A protein has these predicted regions:
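Binding-site signature for planar aromatic cofactors or substrates
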Residues: 3, 9-218
Length: 218
């Protein structure tokens, strides 16, 4: 099973790690997996000759024999479709987030901050290249994101689907390390946290998501 970790490292040590103070560390791997599955549109980072490449992709997050598997596909012309095999790709899951106003704090000697949840997943990639396996990948993706579309997809002409699949490169990443962080005002007083939750709950978008996660902390 991939390990879940957080590191408070000195500068120059473990530079590939996400900075995570202990009170913000997610130590439960299943909690991290559930977050990744809920917020599955992520950012994949690879490095080639010291230069990072980045693509934003929807992922299928699954577990197989106690291993976390991340599955997605690139446009075939995307250079990352080949770069992913070199080194250790990083996939970043980073929603929701919210601005936190100091008006919610008891002391006037306070400054704004940002609450968020983020999971960084590292692993080893393999390509999914055969038409049969790519078809399976696409059906799995449709099943997760819009199951009602499966019937229409199945009815599409075979040559049309084959041409579509020629334009993509599927891949899966077997995760060997997870770094997970939830910065949800754990370092504030209970009254301040409740005031932040009330403030965020009255807003829209990702603020409500952070409020819900904060309310779930006990």
């Amino acid at each position: 099973m991939g390990r879940t970790s957080g590191v408070e490292a000195d500068a120059g040590k473990h530079i590939n790690y996400m900075y995570t103070p202990k009170q913000f560390l997610i130590t439960d791997q299943q909690e991290a997996v559930s977050f990744m599955q809920r917020y599955s549109f992520a950012t994949i980072v690879t490095v080639n000759d010291g230069v990072p490449s980045v693509t934003h992709l929807p992922f299928i997050v699954s577990q197989r024999d106690d291993k976390i598997i991340l599955t997605s596909h690139f446009a075939k012309v995307n250079p990352q479709a080949t770069e992913i095999l070199s080194g250790k790709p990083l996939v970043i899951f980073a929603e929701p987030h919210a601005y936190i106003s100091p008006k919610n704090y008891e002391s006037v000697n306070s400054v704004p901050t940002w609450n968020y949840i983020a999971v960084h997943a590292y692993g080893t990639a393999t390509l999914i290249e055969s038409p049969e396996k790519k078809a399976g990948l696409l059906e799995q993706t449709i099943q997760f994101y819009e199951a009602d579309y499966l019937k229409q997809w199945s009815a599409l002409p075979a040559d049309f689907k084959l041409n579509m699949m020629k334009g993509i490169t599927g891949f899966e990443i077997m995760v060997d390390e997870i770094q997970a962080k939830k910065k949800l005002s754990q370092n504030r007083t209970e009254q301040e946290r409740q005031d932040v939750i009330a403030d965020l709950s009255a807003k829209f978008g990702t603020e409500k998501g952070i409020a819900a996660y904060m309310a779930g902390l006990r």
